[in-house]
């Protein structure tokens, strides 16, 4: 079988070229052309402009034989994780050939990929590299050969262009929206007739554009306490603080402004908003990735253990005088600590005498970072809230903050009574 993985939102002439190349390979081998079509959320973590059903029709009209829906990934995981999962699915389905478009010469793509494979790096491919995602697909396909003892053969065609300009699905969608949901003539030239017809039908039926559930999204952003927001995947402490400061939200673009203040780019902002909308927790992400790890699908530099190990290494090196960036770079080059990362440790509290009588051992301690950047917890005995900064050594405070800012490692706090007083037992993973 010949495979293509795509959004096709909508199918344009560049996509038609992809499908025709796949058709050419398939006809020589007597095989089918399968489109692994993203459903629910796009590969860039946004709601689709065109429905899955309409995009499926477009792909079939363009020459595909079958559509395989890919659902449940793109509102949860970054591309670094969705790519190995999708490639593994295709290999397991029996796909032997993969077709993609690239502006860079295929020999250069293979050369770039070989370097990352040799170093075992699949998530840190520089953004400056052209066709970065194609390089990632090729490298991960080679990595998964170790797991499946087979891999897909890649076929590259040039990226689709009209009059020397690359065809952009984003630009097509923008121009249709800005033209009051009428397809302008310059956009029609970029689309096959079948896509134009299906788009017009979908617009007439009121199915375009797709959108977020803003009622759910804004209510959660406006009302959830800080510790609950911090438990949502892909929100770090800075993002949560700026979200809290930016309340009350009435439109999505207001949330984007808050996320920009936390140095979130467009892709991470879309992913974070999708996680808030769908109430995706850190634990859900952690367990999902761990499940794929057990299947041998996740590259070693992306495992949850490696994320935790990196946090411990950086905290240890910062404690010895290195900067955070220096420690991260040394870790990337293979340096490690001799001791293992702690998955459980205790923190002290600052409690007032009148708060002590309401505390009970085993109570949940909800972690958060206050507006001054101080690590803290909130206890909820009956009828009151008890808030306290956490007492930690510098090394352990750095470790905890890095885990919080990992955006995916779940953290749990429990109140314990010890001889020296009350403590919070922190557990991760």
Regions inferred by a protein language model and the residue ranges of each:
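Short active-site-proximal "capping" loops at secondary-structure junctions
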Residues: 38-43, 73-75, 398
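N-terminal catalytic cores of NTP/NDP-binding nucleotidyl/phosphoryl-transfer enzymes
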Residues: 1-52
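Flexible glycine-rich surface loops and low-complexity tracts that mediate binding to linear polymers
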Residues: 365-367, 406-418
């Amino acid at each position: 079988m010949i495979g293509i993985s795509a959004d096709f939102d909508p199918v344009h002439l560049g996509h038609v070229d992809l499908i025709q190349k796949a058709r050419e390979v398939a006809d020589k081998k007597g095989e089918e052309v399968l489109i692994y079509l993203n459903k629910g959320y796009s590969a860039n973590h946004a709601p689709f402009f065109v429905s899955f059903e309409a995009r499926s029709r477009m792909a079939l009209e363009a020459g595909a034989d079958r559509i395989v829906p890919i659902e449940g990934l793109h509102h949860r995981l970054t591309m670094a994780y969705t790519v190995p999962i999708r490639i593994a699915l295709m290999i397991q389905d029996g796909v032997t050939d993969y077709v993609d478009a690239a502006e860079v010469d295929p020999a250069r793509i293979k050369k770039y990929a070989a370097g990352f494979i040799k170093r075992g790096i699949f998530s840190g491919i520089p953004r400056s590299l052209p066709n970065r995602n194609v390089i990632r697909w090729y490298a991960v396909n080679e990595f998964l050969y170790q797991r499946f003892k087979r891999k897909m053969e890649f076929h590259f065609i040039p990226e689709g262009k009209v009059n020397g300009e690359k065809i952009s699905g984003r630009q097509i969608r923008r121009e249709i929206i800005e033209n009051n949901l009428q397809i302008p003539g310059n956009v029609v030239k970029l689309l096959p007739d079948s896509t134009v017809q299906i788009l017009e039908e979908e617009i007439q039926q009121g199915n375009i554009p797709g959108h977020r559930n803003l009622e759910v999204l804004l209510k959660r952003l406006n009302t959830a306490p800080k510790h609950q927001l911090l438990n949502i995947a892909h929100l770090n402490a800075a993002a949560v603080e700026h979200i809290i400061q930016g309340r009350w939200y009435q439109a999505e673009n207001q949330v984007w402004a808050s996320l920009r203040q936390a140095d979130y780019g467009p892709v991470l902002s879309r992913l974070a908003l999708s996680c808030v909308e769908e109430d995706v927790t850190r634990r859900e992400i952690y367990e999902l990735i761990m499940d794929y790890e057990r299947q041998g699908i996740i590259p070693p530099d992306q495992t949850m253990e490696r994320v935790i190990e990196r946090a411990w290494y950086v905290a240890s090196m910062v404690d010895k005088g290195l900067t955070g960036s220096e420690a991260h770079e040394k870790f990337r080059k293979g340096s490690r600590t001799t001791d293992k990362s702690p998955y459980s440790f205790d923190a002290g509290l600052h409690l007032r005498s009148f708060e002590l009588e309401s505390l009970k051992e085993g109570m949940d301690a909800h972690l958060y970072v206050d507006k001054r950047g101080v690590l803290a917890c909130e206890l909820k005995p009956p009828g009151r809230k008890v808030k306290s900064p956490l007492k930690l050594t510098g090394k352990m405070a750095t470790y905890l903050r890095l885990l919080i800012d990992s955006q995916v490692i779940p953290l749990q706090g429990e109140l314990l009574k010890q001889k020296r007083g009350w403590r919070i037992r922190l557990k991760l993973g």
